[in-house]
């Protein structure tokens, strides 16, 4: 392992929607001595971090619902790196271990924590969600229990474990079964990872929708057997349902995995699934939306949601390590941490064709 030699810098935003790179904690000296580590913590030299849509949203909008950027704030929560220091009471990890960082810190005492649904922790601290500083920096101290060993997996793949966990949580809770006809709404990063998950789960046929022809073409390249549909805003939910059913060979989807959070897309999914079907919303949308209540009621359609994930990371690691799912094509752009502003501009601009933009920080000669 190459020892840390570079100063710690992080990627910040603020209420004025600025984005910049500046010094961050812990300092290089603190990393080298381990003096800032609390019991149970390790220092991770972060090597690859994916830019999530929520990072761009915090930069541009300054908030997501009640989560508001009120001060200088470090972004990023999709990270992997190498352990460079451990507190003396940590036995599960050692210096040199390659890890992916599950970006939450929980209380371990509330009902959700005690019943295994820690994503609902009353006191959760989630990296990059204000006011908790994120992982987009060279070094970060984090509880060892939330640093998952990834063996010889690349850091790029390690940082894809976070969006994979989001999709995996949705597919598990939606109870996708072998041979289920599935509709995936949205061909952004989460939609594409969800597509990979339902394909691995044996769903057939699979249809994916989007408003962007470029993203649909990427989805077809990523998963050749998928059927694609370009959304037309002029169409009613009924028109959408008819088109999807025809594309599926007359078979209505059993489950729609909605990855956009857009009101019209959710309404279209509700209109489309079969009697007794399910619409599972993975995407994040507005505080309030209108839904076709009577369609849900008279067709016995279940409408479900998720909030982040719980207990998915070990499973996600096995899926990537075993080659059951391959997400490498999703990383379309890579930038050094010093070039974070350009990275964020690329991630935010639909014209770039970016799917997953990663920010990376490597020492000279270091394994990736």
UniProtKB/Swiss-Prot annotation:
Induction: Expression is regulated by the cAMP-PKA and HOG1 signaling pathways via the transcriptional activator MSN2.
Cofactor(s) required, per the database record: Zn(2+)
Family annotation (SUPFAM superfamilies): GroES-like, NAD(P)-binding Rossmann-fold domains
Sequence positions that bind NAD(+): 210, 215, 282
Enzyme Commission number, as recorded: 1.1.1.12
Record note on biotechnological use: Liamocins have high bioactivity against the pathogenic bacteria Streptococcus spp. and can be potential new specific inhibitors of oral streptococcal biofilms without affecting normal oral microflora. Liamocins are also able to inhibit human cancer cell lines such as breast cancer cell lines T47D and SK-BR3 or the cervical cancer cell line HeLa.
Binding site for Zn(2+) 2: 107, 110, 113, 121
GO molecular function, one term: L-iditol 2-dehydrogenase (NAD+) activity
Recorded family membership: Belongs to the zinc-containing alcohol dehydrogenase family.
Name of this protein: L-arabinitol 4-dehydrogenase
